[in-house]
Amino acid sequence: KRLQVDSNLSGLTGTTADVFRLLPSVVTDIEGGITFRGSNNPGLLINGVPYGLLEEYSGDMLIQLPALFFDRVSMTSTPSIGLVPDGDAGILNLSSAVYTAADSPLVLTLGAGFQERYNAGAILNLHPGKFHIVGKYNYRREFRKRTFSKSTTNKGGTTVMNNNASARPDVHLADLSVGYDLTANDLITVYGLYNLMDYSRYGKIHNNKLVDGNLQPVMFRHRYNDQRQEAYAAEARWNHTFDNPKDRLDVVFNYNNFGYDEDNEYKNEKPETGKIIAE
């Protein structure tokens, strides 16, 4: 099953996770996690290649990646021999958008929402002589708020924990493809991709204790949980088309790297005095 993003208005302006929801047998949750044919461990590829940024923290990435950046998503439970068959249930593949000389040389996108949520993107499409140059960039800023309450009762009484947290992910995604026609049947291409997701996160946990029917403040916990994910890739391709256009030879060399760093700083505050008692 394949879904062409630019011909589907409900997926055109969304994220990659939004588009996956349009595929049968695929379920995504609010955190971007994917379940495919009952398994939460499908293989995730970009242009048929496994990327580090889609491995351990793939859910976080999929709810940030702009859908139109990839143009097409596809799924298969029986991947071909040309794909790395990781995953318990099959393969979900993201295909980069392909632009030709017939397409606009410059495309600009802009979106905005409530609570300072917005995104902006640009596509540069040039084909001078035998060269094919396509560069894409997208910036996305979001706001997330989480609130929950938990009560624990034991012999010493009831403890109530109220947790309020907010996060502002800043996401940059860029790639550049430069192709050259060696012959009418041979195209060589160099490709690079860079992704940066930088979270600014703060949480405030308010612990109270209910003793003899009276609610007593115990502690405020301030949690500073900033997060940074950075990935880059370099790729070289050779595509040869034989006399029969259906016969092709594709050679791809890809190197990609992924890094993740998360802070977990906290300070415990005594509500009555405002004094920091632990950090």
Q: Where is each model-derived feature located?
A:
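Membrane-embedded beta-strand positions of outer-membrane beta-barrel proteins
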Residues: L106-L110, G135-Y137, V190-G192, L249-F253
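Transmembrane beta-barrel wall of Gram-negative outer-membrane proteins
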Residues: E116-E142, G157-G203, D226-H240
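Short loop/turn motifs that connect adjacent beta-strands in outer-membrane beta-barrel proteins
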Residues: Y99-S104, N185, T241-R248
